UniProtKB/Swiss-Prot annotation:
Keywords: ATP-binding, DNA damage, DNA repair, DNA-binding, Exonuclease, Helicase, Hydrolase, Nuclease, Nucleotide-binding. It comes from the Bacteria. This is RecBCD enzyme subunit RecC. The keyword Hydrolase applies. Belongs to the RecC family. It comes from Buchnera aphidicola subsp. Schizaphis graminum (strain Sg). A helicase/nuclease that prepares dsDNA breaks (DSB) for recombinational DNA repair. Binds to DSBs and unwinds DNA via a highly rapid and processive ATP-dependent bidirectional helicase activity. Unwinds dsDNA until it encounters a Chi (crossover hotspot instigator) sequence from the 3' direction. Cuts ssDNA a few nucleotides 3' to the Chi site. The properties and activities of the enzyme are changed at Chi. The Chi-altered holoenzyme produces a long 3'-ssDNA overhang and facilitates RecA-binding to the ssDNA for homologous DNA recombination and repair. In the RecBCD complex, RecB has a slow 3'-5' helicase, an exonuclease activity and loads RecA onto ssDNA, RecD has a fast 5'-3' helicase activity, while RecC stimulates the ATPase and processivity of the RecB helicase and contributes to recognition of the Chi site. Heterotrimer of RecB, RecC and RecD. All subunits contribute to DNA-binding. GO terms for cellular component: exodeoxyribonuclease V complex. The keyword Cytoplasm does not apply. GO terms for molecular function: ATP binding; DNA binding; DNA helicase activity; exodeoxyribonuclease V activity.
């Protein structure tokens, strides 16, 4: 017998299961109750429910619908060998084989690249799998070569021809041609099912993946066993029944109709055509105590209120449904976290297990969930679990496996290889410690290893480079070995330059590095060339052997992945595809298989994050749906080839899957439904629409509720919208524009390092600051070059050292440090009229320079630039330079130090780079001392590309007053940080009017000056902004432009005022 139990609550249906089991217990105590469903979480919930509510220890067995049907076919047709030859993987490779030999379709040709052929085959295999399940009549007709009887357009008939070729090819391989479509047809023709022992009863809980054809099979076997079909319905009425339809005109925007039309329509028509079906309705009205339950009751009774007298009053205190519009995904999780805290604060009885958070695009939120839910303080920590596709162990292995499979596609630059070494499992395999990682970074930088394992790699990658070892891993290792052997700095041996300052006690680390690079080289060779499918079969186990210690902790995970890999290869082998294939195709195929794999775990006692389908029937007090944008619910489907979408049927329930899941989550929410989505595009800040389902829900509420009888529809709608839809703004919007791009991870690390010390020191009102009146010129200059860093280093004794592992990966440019080093070497030689031939050879062999002629040109240009600087120095270095020690008294302070390079014309300074504000302030302070000591010349500094800066001579009295002012500024800056920064200096350079000694009045110039300040602060992809400075980050929580400009004006005015034009 076939029983249909309908209800709007899953718990009621669970209770009915309990009563049936109690009333008609199974005679065989070893027999298990059969539950057919595809959701393990619901099955766990059923077991928990029965244990909590009845005390029955029933032995349930969960069987997936497709597994049950295939097993049934095997029993019914025991004389047929059923091997599921028509799996998606096997069909893919059979299509590949066919299109290698035939040009029968305009979309793909024999001459096309193998990846294009694979993608086409992969797509078509997916469509044929759907046709087999949802259009068995098409498949059966195609196999009889009756294409025209199906009323499919002529332009689509190529799909039928391709399927016929697949069947013919299967027969040619002497494989079974049985699949669901022809088995279903054969099963339907059976008058009697014999020699099968059916269970006493079967419980079927409806799910959207329950194929309508499966339902026909279940109906057929209900003659031999009791089938209990448990259906969760939002609506009690049979909305497609003739008697009901006459009295109700369906509105186009009716929310329930849009959500459940196909489902309701199909099952009404399906059950109507069968006899011997017993219906049992167990619907229960929701307590009408809030907006959520009133809407659910509207669904239950299928009501739409047309006039004000029938509408419900909307209470502005009601928050049972809320729609939250956020700025970005991270902000969405921050808002959610704060909302969860308020839920717990408002209800002391609320438990984490009473709340569930769902998303159709959960993977895009995982990084933010972990960072926000784990980073909050312990008092506010919320226990949570993310239901991911794979366990952490499987994810870790897959991550490394994909990295290794991608070796043929990378250039093996230093960052890519070091990223691999830093993975814990790889480090353990090659016995490399954390400390040794830091040493490797240093060695790689000194050996100038950039990219390529060896010179042949560059040819392999088809890059336009000369065959040269320079900057490769093996050449860099050779340099390290020579450095250890000769133990001297920068010596040339056999035309290889040794590295400087290499720790010779770390010989074993070079051995580990050589071993690792050799293994990578072997894998690049292994993966670089295409192979026959069978040859790829042992690949995964080889990977585990080379990169992992196979321990008990990961054994199960390795077995799961290996079984999946080998099954994929074995399925492909069944197709008899003989051509060689690249690893990129198998990588893509394997990624798809693993992405469809799901563990479906649910942790008790915490807030679970999961896909909405896992909990759509399970009641929770609070349900949260995040990521409810229009492109996510429902997801847009590309159906250019899909004939199911082109020729739809009422039975195509899977097409509206997201709608149905949303509806079920809605009706299973008990107290509060929280919905959120990102309301603005990150690309262009345009408004992003919410899901159409959210819009329809809002339309239903505004059409059926009112705030005040005195308001018209428009005003009522506006008030309801404003209450339900909450637009969340990011705090400190000004800060967001100016400061928010700070690297938050780095900042958090910094704060973690020194927050306690920082708070402790700043909490002491009377800090002990050195009040010594003895000040060295060196300290004074060091302070004014960077007052904030000096304050931290010398007043607070805090030095922020966050490791920056930014190493050069490209051989096209020189980093700033190497550029300075080269310039300094050449400068000293030219200044002292010494030969630079040997130094040039060392520089070329070091690998610092770009390849070939590029490096030679760069070196010549560098030499030319430095020669120009030296010429300028000789122009002003008329006499032999003098040096003078001094100790002068400025009010109560004694300033001591030494001035060098004193010419008759004044102080002479030079720099091999561009002159910046720190160079100018340094020269200014020295110039003040020079003038106080009686100097009457101009102090000047010569820089790169004829850059020149000088000061007019000052009277001793004026210089004395200025120096006293800067000393007082120094003493104050030692107590409280002085906000004198480059952003302010650049602003002041633009806006200062030297002629009138004031700020320029022109508004256009002012705007440009503020723009310069902003760009200096923010930086760009080439230049790091000042906002990234860790010391500044500790002082400034938001950009205070007014304060920065005021301080800059005070301290830079004397410098620009006395600057020589």
């Amino acid at each position: 017998m076939f029983f249909v139990y309908r209800s709007n609550q899953i718990d009621i249906l669970f209770t009915k299961i309990c009563k049936i089991i109690k009333k008609k217990p199974l005679l065989n105590i070893f027999e298990r109750e059969i539950i057919i469903h595809d959701n393990e979480i619901l099955f766990q919930n059923l077991n928990t429910f029965i244990a909590n509510h009845t005390g029955i220890a029933a032995d349930f067995k969960l069987i997936y619908p497709n597994v049950f049907i295939w097993k049934l076919f095997k029993q019914v047709f025991s004389d047929i060998q059923l091997n599921n030859i028509f799996s998606r993987s096997t069909i893919t490779w059979k299509i590949m084989k066919i299109i290698e030999e035939n040009d029968f379709c305009k979309f793909v040709q024999k001459k096309d690249k193998i990846m294009k052929k694979f993608e086409f085959s992969f797509l078509m295999s997916h469509l044929y799998q759907q046709y087999i399940l949802y259009r068995p009549n098409w498949i059966n007709m195609w196999e009889k070569n009756k294409k025209n009887t199906l009323k499919i357009e002529k332009k689509d008939e190529w799909q039928a021809k391709l399927w016929i070729k697949i069947i013919l090819y299967t027969e040619k391989l002497q494989q079974s041609k049985w699949h669901f479509s022809n088995l279903f047809k054969k099963f339907k023709t059976l008058k009697k099912i014999e020699h099968i022992k059916f269970p006493k009863r079967i419980f079927i809980i409806y799910s959207i993946s329950l194929n309508p054809k499966y339902m026909e099979i279940f109906k057929k076997i209900s003659t031999y066993t009791d089938i209990y079909f448990l259906s969760i319905n939002a609506c009690e009425k049979k909305i497609f029944h003739i008697s009901f339809a006459k009295n109700y005109v369906v509105q186009k925007n009716n929310l329930l109709m849009n959500l459940s039309e196909k489902y309701e329509k199909f099952y009404f028509l399906f059950f109507k055509k069968f006899k011997k079906i017993k219906y049992n309705n167990f619907f229960q009205k929701n307590n009408s105590n809030n907006l959520l339950n009133i809407v659910k009751n509207d669904f239950l009774n299928f009501k739409e209120k047309e006039n004000l007298l029938k509408k419900n009053s909307f209470l502005l205190k009601d928050n049972s449904i809320s729609i939250n519009i956020c700025c970005d995904k991270k902000h969405e999780i921050e808002v959610l976290y704060n909302k969860l805290l308020s839920f717990f604060n408002e209800d002391s009885k609320l438990k984490p297990s009473d709340i569930v958070i769902t998303s159709f695009s959960l993977n895009t939120y995982i990084i933010y969930i972990n960072s926000i839910f784990k980073s909050k303080n312990k008092k506010e920590k919320i226990p949570f679990y993310i239901s991911k596709k794979h366990s952490d162990k499987i994810e870790k292995i897959l991550f490394i496996f994909n990295k290794i499979l991608n070796l043929p596609n990378i250039r093996c630059n230093n960052e890519e290889i070091l990223d691999l070494i830093e993975i814990q499992d790889i480090r353990d395999k090659f016995d490399i410690s954390e400390e040794e990682i830091n040493i490797l970074y240093e060695w790689i930088e000194k050996a100038n290893i950039r990219w390529g394992l060896h010179e042949n790699e560059k040819q392999k990658n088809n890059l336009i480079f000369i065959k040269k070892n320079q900057n490769t891993w093996f050449y860099g290792i050779k340099k390290l070995l020579i450095s250890h052997a000769i133990n001297e700095e920068e010596e040339v041996w056999n035309n290889v330059l040794s590295c400087t300052s290499i720790n010779t006690s770390r010989t074993e680390l070079i051995g580990k590095l050589i071993n690792f690079i050799k293994v990578l080289d072997q894998w690049r060779d292994k993966l670089f060339f295409s192979k026959k499918i069978k040859s790829w079969r042992p690949l995964f186990l080889c990977f585990i052997k080379d990169f992992f210690y196979k321990n008990e902790k990961i054994r199960d995970s390795i077995d799961i992945i290996n079984k999946t890999w080998t099954k994929m290869i074995d399925d492909a082998t069944l197709s008899n595809y003989e051509k060689k294939i690249p690893i990129s195709i198998l990588k893509k195929k394997f990624s798809h298989i693993m992405n469809n794999f799901s563990e479906k775990k649910f942790l008790p006692g915490v807030i679970n994050f999961c896909h909405p389908s896992l909990v759509c029937y399970i009641p929770f007090k609070i349900k949260c749906i995040i990521g409810a944008e229009y492109q996510e619910i429902p997801k847009k489907k590309l159906s250019s080839f899909n004939l199911i979408d082109k020729y739809p049927l009422t039975s195509d329930l899977h097409i509206c899957k997201e709608n149905y899941i949303f509806l079920q989550n809605f009706i299973s929410t008990q107290e509060t439904l929280y919905i959120s989505y990102v309301g603005h595009s990150l690309k262009n800040n345009n408004k992003v629409r919410s899901s159409i389902l959210i819009d329809q829900l809002l339309n239903h509420i505004t059409s059926n509720f009112y705030v005040s009888e005195h308001h018209d529809y428009k005003n009522n709608k506006k008030e309801i919208f404003e209450h339900i839809c909450k637009k969340h703004k990011k705090e400190n919007l000004y800060e967001k524009k100016q400061v928010n791009k700070i690297n938050l991870n780095t900042l958090q690390k910094t704060k973690k390092i020194n927050q306690e010390i920082y708070n402790k020191i700043f909490s002491i009102k009377n800090r002990i600051i050195s009040t010594s009146t003895q000040i060295s010129l060196k300290s004074l200059i060091s302070f004014w070059k960077n007052p904030i860093r000096y304050f931290f280093n010398y007043t607070l004794n805090i030095k922020l050292k966050i490791a920056k592992r930014n190493i050069i990966t490209e051989p096209f440019s020189i980093n700033l440090f190497d550029d300075f080093k080269i310039s300094n070497i050449i400068f000293k030689k030219i200044l002292n009229n010494e030969s630079i031939k040997d130094e040039f050879k060392k520089i070329i062999l070091s690998g610092i320079l770009p390849y070939g002629h590029f490096g030679s040109i760069l070196l010549k240009e560098k030499k030319k630039e430095i020669e120009n600087i030296v010429k300028a120095i000789y122009k002003y270095r008329i006499s032999s330079p003098k040096k003078e020690n001094f100790d002068i008294k400025i009010e109560k302070y004694n300033i001591n130090g030494c001035l060098d390079e004193i010419q008759n014309t004044g102080l002479l300074r030079w720099k091999l780079g561009t002159i910046n504000y720190r160079d100018r302030i340094s020269l200014w302070l020295e110039h003040l001392i020079y003038c106080i000591l009686g100097g009457t010349g101009e102090s000047k500094i010569i820089g790169y590309k004829k850059n020149f800066f000088s000061f007019y001579p000052l009277s001793s009295h004026l210089a004395y007053n200025y120096l006293f002012t800067y000393i007082e500024g120094y003493m104050k800056g030692m107590k409280n940080p002085l906000l004198l920064i480059k952003s302010g200096s650049n602003w002041f350079d633009k806006v200062y009017d030297k002629k009138n000694d004031c700020i320029k009045k022109n508004d256009d110039i002012k705007r440009k000056a503020y723009k310069i300040l902003y760009h200096t602060w923010m930086g760009n992809e080439y230049i790091t902004g000042e906002k990234e400075d860790l010391y500044i980050q500790q002082i400034i929580s938001e950009l205070n432009v007014k304060k920065i400009c005021k301080i800059s004006q005070k301290w830079f005015t004397p410098i620009l005022k006395h600057q020589k034009k």
